[in-house]
Structures are given as C-alpha cells and as structure tokens.
C-alpha cells in the first residue's frame, strides 16, 4: 500500500458565492439539520488516455466539506483523503493496485463555493476490464463518499475512450447548454468520421413504486442523423437546442459517446412550468391537471404549496426543501433523462436520503431505517445497460411499497418534510 500526503491550495474558483457555513475552530460534531444537503458531491470521469494508462479525473464540490482551524492565527482548511483499490474484473479477490493520499484546501474567513479538480493515473492494459473501488473521506466531518467504477478496456469504442471539454474545461457529466461548442478527444486515431444520432424525445417521469403498469423499454431509434469529420483524433460539435446526441464511431454496434443539452438552470429548476411537473409525485391527479392546464404556472404552484403549508412561512420552507431534493436528484441520478424523472430521483425526492446504500455491479439497494428493525424498508434498483448512460437504474416495483409511499406523500401534504432521520 502506498501512502502519500499532498497539500494543495486551489486559488481558482468556479463559483462566486461566499458562505460562512462549515467553519469551526474546534473539531466539529456531526449535526444534520437538513440531511438532504449533507451529501458530498463528487463527479468522476475515466479516460483511457493510452494503451497502458487510465486517468481518473475528480471534481469535488466544497459546499458540504467541513472547514476548521485549530486557532484564529491560521486559515480554515478542509482535509480530504482519497483511497482506491483496483481489481481485475475476472478476479476481484486479487488487488492489482492501491493508493491513499490526502490533500488540504485552505480558505480565509470567507469560504467560497468552488469546485476542486484532482486527477491520478492507473496502470491498465488494453484487452482487460477492471473494477475501481473509490473512497473519498471528509476527514474533518468523518464521512465517506463511496463509488465503484467499471473500467472498460476491452471495447475501444466505449465512452471511456473519449474526453469531452468545453472552454478548455473537462465535462464531468457531458451536459451542455443549447448551441454550446463541445470538443471531443479520441485516445487513438481509429476513425476519420463519426455518425451523430439525434434524439429529441421528451421522456416521461417515473411511475409510483407500487405501479404494475408496463414500462416501455428504451429503444434505439434516432430522430435524425448526420456525419461529422474527425481530424487528428479531435473534433468540435455544436449542441442541439434540446435533446441529446449519441456519437458512434463504428457500424457494428451502438457504443459511443452521448452529449446532453440541458437548460442553464440545470441541475436546478428552469421555470414555473417545470416546478409544476416536478411536483407531480405529491399532487392528486386533479391538482396536477389543474396546474398543468393553467396559463399562470407561478400562481398555480404558489397556491398548491400554500394550501398544504397553511402559512407563507411554512409553504416557503416546504417548497425550498422539496426543490432542493429535485436539484440533488438531477445532480446524482441524471442519465438520458433528468434525475428527478428517474426511479432513484423519485424515491430520493419523496423519502429523502437513505440510511444506507449497498452497491454492486448489478445495482443498488437503499435502506430506510435501522437494520433488523421491522419498520425498516428497502428499495432495490437494477442497473440497465444502454448505449446512452452508465447511470441508468430501474426500481424493482412491488405492491409492498404502497403503504410506505402514501405515508410519505401524506407527510408532505400535511405540511411536513418526510425524512427517515426526523421521523
């Protein structure tokens, strides 16, 4: 096991917001006033940049990091530990490589919201697939972010063989604005042209967890296509006004790179109409029809929240908490569909942050409540293989969830935020 201590101070900030949250002179105790916003935000990109190496790019949002200082004579600092273990896909009991390192981000009295970029290289070989277990720890807060990543080196056309940037910055989620210019770099000069398939379909929102309605399988059926030229393993492309592009570099399958167009507010809510749509999970059918057919979406959504909140102050708090969950869902669960529309997004919005999440290569299980407690319930999501996204999961639906669903929805409709930590 190699262990490195790396102290890095970052002076370039992506965000301009200034905050005095998460500052301590003494070691902080864990206190969750709003668990919905307690998640460490880490975006990851894997790029097979050569035949023998894979670069792991990390982008850490400092919003939920804890900054502290031993006394008033020194700067506030956040300390993060990064640990990984690399396995061969065919033998996960044998460790190929492992590494731990720490870095410290220093700040003055006014802690600015920013993105912290990091990267490290792995020794990998063409023709092999790997499993990377990644643990990122906020040392001051004593909380972990865990992620298991599959490294695909058998398929030279998989998305990990391409790196996307815009304005010379790495894109961690391949989401862009309408008409934005995107640069794509290939790791090898394998082709001179690529096929761009265009998809402009508006995908529906998730059905309730107990629904027995048939869910249409996602079919590969582009609305249109065009050819783009590649020069020196590099090309630029202008994003569509809506929908997404799927770029294929061969004719034998649909593997390739997907680029998405979302509005400028993303991962937040763009307008009052989308606020109405995202509130479908706690609205009755009649309320939803009334709100979606009105000519004044703002008045309709304000009236709805006031009706369940009972007062302006309470309505504002409910609205804030609900749409914060919508935003977090977009950050965490977006695939070819916005995160709030997905199965995981729906569960997160209604039930809040799980007590525990268990992950493996086949999917995830979310636990709400303490283990071995009869009132504890679980949601199981299965990972779906599709050419557009590796973040597509489908809930295993069951009538068992009906009581829990209506209980949680009733919490919201009674003017209370449902959260397993606060029940």
Outline where the language-model segments fall.
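Sec-dependent N-terminal signal peptides
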Residues: 4-13
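Intrinsically disordered, low-complexity terminal regions enriched in Ser/Thr/Pro/Gly
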Residues: 18-222, 229-231
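Short, flexible loop/turn segments at beta-strand junctions in immunoglobulin-like
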Residues: 122-124, 236-240
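Short, aromatic- and glycine-rich surface loops/edge beta-strands on solvent-exposed regions
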Residues: 128-138, 240-253
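Low-complexity, Pro/Ser/Thr- and charge-rich linker/hinge segments at domain boundaries
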Residues: 152-177, 260-286, 324
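Early exported N-terminus immediately downstream of N-terminal targeting peptides
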Residues: 268-319
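A cross-family detector of function-defining hotspots
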Residues: 297, 305-336, 340, 344-390, ...
């Amino acid at each position: 096991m190699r262990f490195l201590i790396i102290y890095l101070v970052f002076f370039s900030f992506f965000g301009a917001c200034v905050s005095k949250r998460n500052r301590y002179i003494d070691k902080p105790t864990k206190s969750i006033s709003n668990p919905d916003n307690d998640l460490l935000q880490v975006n990851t990109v894997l790029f097979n940049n050569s035949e023998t190496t894979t670069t792991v790019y990390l982008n850490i949002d400092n919003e939920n990091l804890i900054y502290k200082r031993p006394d008033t004579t020194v700067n506030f600092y956040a300390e993060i530990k990064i640990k990984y273990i690399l396995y061969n896909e065919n033998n996960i009991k044998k460790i190929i490589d492992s590494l731990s390192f720490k870095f410290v981000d220093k700040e003055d009295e006014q802690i600015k919201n920013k993105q912290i970029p990091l990267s490290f290289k792995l020794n990998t070989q063409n023709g092999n697939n790997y499993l990377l277990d990644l643990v990122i720890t906020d040392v001051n807060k004593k909380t972990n972010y865990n992620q298991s990543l599959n490294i695909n080196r058998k398929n030279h056309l998989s998305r990990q063989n391409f790196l996307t940037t815009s304005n010379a910055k790495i894109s961690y989620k391949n989401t862009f604005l309408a008409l934005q210019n995107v640069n794509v770099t290939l790791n090898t000069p394998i082709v001179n042209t690529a096929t761009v398939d265009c998809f402009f379909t508006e995908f529906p929102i998730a059905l309730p967890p107990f629904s027995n309605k048939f869910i249409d399988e996602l079919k590969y059926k582009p609305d249109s296509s065009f050819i783009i030229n590649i020069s020196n393993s590099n090309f630029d492309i202008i994003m569509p006004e809506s929908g997404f592009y799927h770029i294929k570099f061969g004719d034998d399958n649909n593997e390739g790179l997907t680029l998405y167009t979302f509005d400028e507010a993303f991962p937040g809510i763009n307008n009052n109409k989308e606020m109405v749509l995202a509130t479908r999970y706690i609205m009755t059918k009649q309320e939803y029809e009334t709100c979606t057919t009105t000519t004044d979406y703002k008045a309709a959504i304000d009236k709805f929240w006031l009706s369940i909140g009972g007062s302006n102050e309470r309505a504002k708090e409910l609205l804030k908490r609900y749409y914060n969950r919508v935003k977090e869902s977009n950050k965490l669960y977006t695939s070819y569909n916005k995160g709030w529309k997905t199965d995981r997004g729906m569960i997160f919005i209604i039930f809040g942050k799980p007590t525990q999440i268990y992950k493996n290569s086949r999917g995830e299980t979310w636990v709400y409540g303490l283990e071995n407690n009869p009132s504890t319930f679980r949601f199981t999501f299965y990972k779906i293989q599709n050419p557009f996204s590796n973040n597509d999961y489908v809930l295993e639906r069951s009538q068992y969830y009906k009581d829990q669903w209506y209980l949680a929805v009733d919490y919201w409709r009674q003017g209370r935020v449902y959260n397993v930590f606060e029940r």
